[in-house]
Amino acid sequence: MTTMTDLKKTPFHKAHVEHGAKLVEYTGWEMPLLYTSIIEEHRQVREAGGLFDVSHMGRFTFKGRDAGRFLDRVCTRDIANMQDRQVRYALVCNEEGGCRDDVLVYRQSETEYTMVCNAANRSKLVDHFAEVKGDLVYRFADITDKTAMVALQGPKVMDVLAGFSKEIPTLKRYRFTEKSLFIAKFLVSRTGY
């Protein structure tokens, strides 16, 4: 039996505890369920905005000359022909056509991609990708434990982000940009669905 002390913690765990979050187990991670009440927090996000720690979601990088070809092999969408800084929603299917997971694929360049997957399917996808790699040349890395991820949602979040960058509020849907602040690098996208 897994105890709360055995669970993975996101980089924001300390802040969740300090701000009184009710923490629960979710796919092997200790995650905040709520801070005040579900109704109050729902209303806040619908009327203004909210920040969600989604660091438990899987994040992979694919780099090298065949990275796009490999992603075309495992995804239901055309990935290699995406534009730079474009994001595409896709499915990763099994050999019978059933869905292993739904993912978002980000194209940094012709030879560099990032994928975000659901936390519950992360290890299954890592295994699947290793099985079907074949002779394609690319480097795969699971960067989940080395990075953090947040989602900002709500009608007023662009007003807040405008104070940090003039570019971010002008991003089109399913596009991204890369920013930095001090030593931290950020990938910022408009990908809600």
Report the location of each language-model feature.
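Basic, glycine/lysine-rich polyanion-binding surfaces/domains
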Residues: M1-Y193
